[in-house]
Design a protein with these regions (language model features):
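Beta-strand/loop nucleic-acid-binding surfaces
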Residues: 28-45
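Short, flexible beta-strand-to-coil junctions
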Residues: 24-28, 56-58
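Residue-level recognition of beta-strand microenvironments
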Residues: 8-10
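Short coil-to-beta-strand transition motifs
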Residues: 1-4
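OB-fold/S1-family single-stranded nucleic acid-binding modules
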Residues: 56-71
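Short aromatic-glycine-enriched beta-strand elements
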Residues: 12-23
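Loop/turn positions that initiate beta-strands
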Residues: 48-50
Length: 71
């Protein structure tokens, strides 16, 4: 699913970097939250980024930067 990051909150747990994300799927208004380790998301995520969200059984397991749309 395609979405936009609304908030990105980095934190560390037992020495491992994680991110708490608030994202809004395209075409929806209700935000969703996800917590992912640094290896499940691209480097330096920022609010406003367009992303491609991958989930298994409704659980987000990977977030990639969405390719730029051509005009």
């Amino acid at each position: 699913m395609r979405a936009h990051l609304q908030a990105v909150m980095p934190y560390e747990l037992h020495g491992t970097p994680y991110y708490q994300l608030v994202l809004v799927p395209d075409g929806e208004q209700r935000p969703q939250q996800a917590r992912l380790s640094h290896d499940m998301i691209y480097a330096d995520p920022r609010p406003g980024d367009a992303v491609e969200v991958h989930a298994i059984l409704g659980i987000i397991d990977r977030v990639e930067r969405a390719p730029a749309e051509e005009s």
